[in-house]
A protein has these predicted regions:
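N-terminal Rossmann-like or analogous alpha/beta NTP/dinucleotide-binding catalytic cores
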Residues: 1-11, 18-138, 292-295
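A generic short-segment signal for beta-strand/edge and adjacent turn/coil regions
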Residues: 13-16, 151, 173, 213
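Glycine- and acidic
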Residues: 13-18, 146-147, 261-265
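A short glycine/serine-rich beta->alpha loop
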Residues: 16-22, 116-118, 147-151, 231-235
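Compositionally biased, low-complexity linear motifs
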Residues: 35-42, 144-146, 205-207
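Active-site oxyanion-binding pockets that recognize sulfate/phosphate
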Residues: 57, 148, 152, 269
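Positively charged, phosphate-engaging catalytic surfaces used for nucleic-acid and nucleotide handling
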Residues: 83-203, 241-243
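Conserved nucleotide- and phosphate/pyrophosphate-binding catalytic cores
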Residues: 143, 156-157, 163-308
Length: 308
């Protein structure tokens, strides 16, 4: 915040594991990166293809194809690639070099304590991610600077490890420990604790047909009561409603409008069918516009990633 106010150098860094299409979680991260980039941050976006290989056994050829789509999504959302650094872990030598250094700063016991009993490749992947997070402070990008890393709360372990490594290697590299923001893990559209690829009805991607997304929203769980009469009398429960949640976190920018929706649901004047219909139109319009932009940016994404 001080760097933004005082117009000093700072960076924002995050990325994506290229295992599938953009969904609301990756959308949240992308929007945060773009926000900080517009505030003057040097922006870095990693394609975590080494992690995808170690964790999901996806080949670099497979993740290359997925990454092109991911980057086209990022560009369509407003990322300025001319003033940012987009890269694949597999191709970024500076990240891999830092991981080699960091290997001397952790023990096997530490990695087991953080990540549990896993194969060595996943521990290596964690060190690669530390290299990603600290890449903005590499001398080639201007050296040490405050860095913010927007991630989901499930990535907290990586940030804690990286801050520890930044302190351990401060004398050698003069790192400033990175800060982080944690975005909300959204409930599944089916009412589950979070959206999951295991259940296609619990989430949607930005590349699904808009009508299919509309159908998922229409079929979604809500915080409504058993009957219309009961809802009008007792009010709905927006706190458990994924429709309210995706609207609040993604598709309605005006806080007053979000508060109005909450209060109308709570007092029973807004019924679930009406709310779903409104949200469905907002989401479908956003997705249609996004897909039009994305289609025009696929070739640019291929060029950025060096894909023929």
């Amino acid at each position: 915040q001080a760097s933004m106010k005082e117009k000093k150098d700072f960076a924002v860094m995050s990325g994506i594991k290229p295992t599938g299409e953009f969904h609301l979680g990756t959308l949240m991260t992308a929007k945060e990166i773009i926000y900080f980039q517009k505030q003057g941050a040097q922006a870095f976006y990693a394609i975590a293809d080494i992690e995808a290989y170690e964790d999901n056994r996806l080949s670099f050829e497979e993740t290359e194809k997925i990454a092109v789509g991911n980057i086209a999504d990022l560009l369509a959302l407003g990322f300025d690639h001319k003033n940012g650094h987009i890269y694949r872990q597999y191709k970024e030598q500076r990240v891999r070099d830092m991981a080699v250094h960091f290997g001397a700063g952790v023990t096997l016991a530490t990695m087991k304590a953080i990540y549990g009993e896993r194969h060595i490749g996943l521990y290596l992947s964690a060190l690669i991610q530390a290299g990603d997070i600290l890449l903005p402070q590499h001398k080639d990008f201007g050296g040490p600077k405050p860095t913010v890393v927007p991630v989901g709360v499930d990535q907290d372990a990586h940030l804690r490890l990286t801050r520890d490594l930044a302190n351990k290697f401060r004398k050698k590299f003069k790192f400033i420990p990175p800060s982080s923001t944690y975005h909300k893990i959204l409930k599944g559209l089916d009412g589950s604790a979070k959206m999951s690829k295991r259940n296609p009805m619990s989430y949607f991607t930005l590349n699904e047909p808009p009508k299919a997304i509309g159908k998922k929203i229409a079929c979604a769980f809500t915080g409504g009561r058993a009957t219309v009469e009961e809802q009008k009398k007792l009010g709905g429960i927006p706190e458990i409603c994924p429709i309210y949640e995706i609207e609040m976190c993604h598709f309605v920018e005006d806080d007053k409008e979000v508060c109005k929706t909450y209060n109308c649901c709570k007092c029973g004047s807004l019924l679930c069918g009406e709310h779903k219909a409104k949200t469905k139109q907002i989401v479908m319009k956003f997705v249609e516009e996004h897909q039009r932009k994305r289609e025009k940016l696929v070739d640019t994404a291929r060029e950025i990633l060096g894909v023929d």
